[in-house]
Amino acid sequence: MFGPFWDKAQTIRTSEDWLNRAGWLGDSPQGSSEWYNPIVMSKMSLLHDASIYNSFDTDNFVWIDGGITNTINYNLLIEERFFDKLEKYLDPFLFVQYPYPYYGQGVKEVHGFEWEALNRMAGGTVEWICRGGLFGGNKEAIKEVNSYYWHLLNDSLNEGFMGTEESLFSILAEKYPELCRATRIGINGHIQEFVQKALDD
């Protein structure tokens, strides 16, 4: 899955140019662990694979991070009404976005991804960042978004740019707004806000 991109990702991760884009990068998981980005950047393919195997013969698929209950009360996620109400947000593909707190404040990267390059690849100014802890859609949309995602990953790594999956999701949401239906939450970026929003809808 990530194999063809491994060497490029490690070259960027260990380069002085990338590490110097922000003081925190070197000590962050994506900077200090060779496995962090290959794993989180493979979420889209894992979701796509699940939609192909489709063991439950369903139309919609959602990625939920295994550790998401560190920030969301698990009782909300086992609430049957949530999954019933979630369905309408998955048409065609859901990203949950929060306003980038450093937008317009001179910060030159988003999760390590160079800001100007991110906007150029998005074809517009990215003011909202997509969360990677919960996303999904219908089978057809997942197939399309997955294709765009891996082309974008390839192009960005070839140009020497790397953030996390959230950087790439944010580009896709800006570039393909009719396909990637963004639902916005507050500046803290906690997905629990979206879960509660869906429950209250």
Could you tell me what each predicted segment is?
Residues 1-55:
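Active-site-proximal specificity loops/subdomain of glycosyltransferases
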Residues 8-11, 74-76, 107-109:
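Short aromatic-enriched loop/helix-cap "lid" or pocket-rim segments at secondary-structure transitions
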Residues 39-97:
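GT-A fold catalytic core of metal-dependent nucleotide-sugar glycosyltransferases
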Residues 50, 96-99, 138, 172:
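Structured loops at beta-to-helix junctions and adjacent beta-edge loops in soluble globular domains
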Residues 54-60, 106-117:
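Surface-exposed flexible segments
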Residues 68-70, 74, 114-201:
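Catalytic core and acceptor-binding pocket of nucleotide-sugar-dependent glycosyltransferases
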